[in-house]
A protein has these predicted regions:
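N-terminal cap/lid subdomain of alpha/beta-hydrolase-fold enzymes
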Residues: 27-45, 86-180, 464
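A catalytic-pocket lid/entrance helix-loop region that shapes and gates access to the active site
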Residues: 131-134, 229-321
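Alpha/beta-hydrolase active-site loop
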Residues: 154-157, 164, 181-200
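Alpha/beta-hydrolase fold nucleophile elbow
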Residues: 204-216
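Glycine-rich nucleophile elbow surrounding the catalytic serine of serine-hydrolase chemistry
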Residues: 213-226
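Short alpha-helix in the alpha/beta-hydrolase fold that links the catalytic acid
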Residues: 223, 441, 455-465
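Alpha/beta-hydrolase fold catalytic core
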Residues: 306-453
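Catalytic histidine-centered segment of alpha/beta-hydrolase-like enzymes
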Residues: 483-492
Length: 507
């Protein structure tokens, strides 16, 4: 399973603690409790750990948007899932934000993070929700606070953020029941069922339905959309993917085969251009051309010798910032060597999640860069405690259950073969079918330039090899400054929100 080490923001980590973070309460205007929904009274609690779950909480709020004040209803609660024998198999936690309008055709977007094993707090408090986590000066999770989100997607779509079983406050009914959900197809089926339940119970059949997923959540989005069509009779209008894993063979072969390395190189070069202050899309386009021509040919062919080897490795070193001797030693397959060798002697370690992000190396004496990631295991952990405080203090959902922001045990137990899959997971065929079967279906894929976990060039390669009839606006790639969670940069978040809005405005 080593090739999945960097699958998403959910790998190689334990459950996050639920300490309450400091926050502002400016977004609580109009946020008084309005009681519990009928669904919450029906589905609260349950056996074992599920007894810690309270009834659904419904609160009313307002937020300022570019179009003026927006009143909305927030629901924090759970859906019950049942097995074939009619026994309760799981409780699925969700957070819904619904504008108080009388328009029955307002879009609704179903949102989840990745992992497998990541909760939805990242996208909730990081990008789309009405409240957002602010980290102050720099990336310091010790000072996180909540503020109104000026770029909330609630301005143009209702939102339903879902935590898969084992993440957030979603739990299997039995302690050993997770295996019933922790597989590619089983996961997609359970998420599709939750979406179908929400649509039915909230009379959203007439609403255009979109899916937003990050990292493995992008892969999940394609699988869920197909299950919705085939098993639930629900046809999604589109998918938006943030830093998605689409083709595992390409995305995790950067140190194994030539094409994988070639699709990694532009992200490494993007980070070096950022460090030099010379980043432009035009400069990066030159790297992309080199990556799929001279670089790919050199790595795929016999080992270079003599002057040709020196010239080639020197060029790669200049593009990436790595010392030439390191590039030569690795014969151009440089991703894994990158994190510990970028600046020999400075004792820094670089993040795979954002190659521009580096911190002091906690183990400079070790040759390998494996271990905690500066970005993944750093400030972003504060999203967990921030969400616990948000749910308790503003949404009225109070529980002593641990909020699982990132669950490493799920990733380790995931069944990649589930549902007739292959050892290298792929969602490209699902996207082809979705685009072919629904002529109005829209796909937007968003990436950060300096993400080494899910390099943007992989998605470009996949889109370039889609059938000709889906080219253009129906399937598009958008790129932003930053890494895997590029939305932690306010300017990139604002730009992506504006781009995403065009999907919803399309006829």
């Amino acid at each position: 399973m080593r090739r999945f080490r960097f699958f998403t923001i959910a790998l190689a980590i334990a459950l996050v603690a639920t300490a309450v973070a400091a926050q502002e309460h400016s977004g609580r205007s109009g946020g008084e409790r309005s009681g519990h929904g009928e669904q919450g009274r029906q589905e609260q609690g349950g056996p074992g750990v599920l007894s810690l779950l309270p009834t659904d909480s419904v609160t009313e709020h307002t937020i300022g948007t570019a179009a003026g004040k927006l009143a909305y209803t927030a629901t924090a609660g759970t859906f019950a899932l049942f097995d074939q024998s009619g026994e309760r198999s799981a409780a699925i936690f969700y957070t819904a934000f619904v504008a108080r309008s009388a328009n029955p055709t307002r879009p609704v977007t179903f949102v989840f993070n990745g992992g497998p094993g990541a909760g939805s707090a990242f996208l909730n408090l990081g990008m789309v929700g009405p409240r957002i986590a602010a980290f102050g000066n720099g990336f310091d999770g010790s000072s996180v606070r909540l503020v109104d989100n000026p770029d909330t997607w609630l301005a143009f779509t209702d939102l339903v953020l879902i935590d898969p079983v084992g993440t957030g406050w979603s739990r299997p009914a039995k302690p050993d029941g997770g295996s019933s959900f922790w597989g590619v197809h089983r996961d997609a089926e359970s998420m599709a069922k939750v979406i179908a339940l929400y649509v039915a119970k909230n009379s959203r059949v007439s609403s255009p339905k979109y899916i937003l997923g990050e990292s493995y959540g992008g892969f999940r989005a394609a699988k869920v959309a197909r299950v919705l069509q085939t098993s639930q009779g629900i046809v999604p209008s589109g998918i938006l993917m943030v830093s998605p894993m689409i083709e595992g063979h390409f995305q995790f072969g950067g140190d194994q085969f030539a094409l994988g390395a070639a699709l990694q190189l532009p992200s490494l070069a993007a980070a070096e251009l950022e460090r030099k202050g010379t980043f432009t899309p035009a400069a990066l386009a030159q790297v992309e051309h080199f990556a799929l021509t001279d670089y790919l040919a050199a790595l795929a062919g016999p080992p270079l010798r003599g002057d040709a080897a020196h010239a080639f490795y020197a060029r790669v070193a200049q593009m990436t910032g790595l010392p030439e001797d390191v590039v030569t030693r690795e014969r151009g397959f440089i991703r894994d060597a990158y994190v510990k060798n970028l600046r020999p002697g400075d004792h820094k370690i670089v993040s795979h999640y954002d190659a521009t992000f580096a911190v002091d190396d906690p183990n400079p004496e070790q040759a390998s860069g494996r271990g905690p990631d500066p970005f993944l295991d750093g400030f972003i952990r504060a999203y967990g405690s921030a969400f616990v405080a948000y749910a308790r203090d503003e949404l009225g959902f109070k529980t002593d259950m641990t909020y699982n922001l990132l669950a490493s045990d799920i990733s380790g137990k995931w069944d990649w073969e589930d549902g007739g899959g292959h050892s290298q997971p792929s969602a490209a065929e699902d996207l082809r079918q979705l685009l072919a079967l629904t002529p109005s279906f829209r796909l937007m894929i968003a990436h950060g330039y300096s993400d080494l976990v899910t390099p943007f060039a992989v998605s470009r390669y996949i889109l370039n090899h889609m059938p000709p009839n889906v080219e253009g606006e129906r399937a598009e790639l958008r790129l932003y400054r930053g890494g895997h969670m590029f939305y932690t940069d306010p300017q990139s978040r604002k730009a992506f929100t504006a781009d995403a809005r065009t999907i919803y405005a399309a006829p």
